Amino acid sequence: MDKYKNMTCLIADDFSTARRIIKNALQELGFSCLEAENGEQALEIIEQTTINLLIADVHMPDKSGMEILEDIRADDILKDIPVILTMIEPLDKIIAEGEDLGMNDYLVKPFDVFMLSKVLDKVIETELGESL
């Protein structure tokens, strides 16, 4: 499958196993992937590299996925990058905060390639105007 072959996703998660699983799933869908092990590193990559999508864990050291989202949405150049937050539990408070800050969607860990693909299709079609 290569419907996302010209797209780059940054995966920000402090657990290398989670990054690897998400990366493998994204590559299976055709994405090129970059990785960050914390929020500060993610922001550095975002400021230096063009990405089409950010998938960030809600809970990370230095800067959480929520803080990265807030920083991106406050930046005139970066504000349109689609952001999917990942979390272990779908707590209403966290989801509401993410929505208030402008997250595009969320995934609850663990998730499979089918669920990831479903969320990606929705986000990419809605936010980037590309029908898949």
Outline where the language-model segments fall.
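Short hydrophobic/Thr-rich beta-strand motif most characteristic of the beta2 strand and flanking loop
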Residues: 30-37, 45, 107
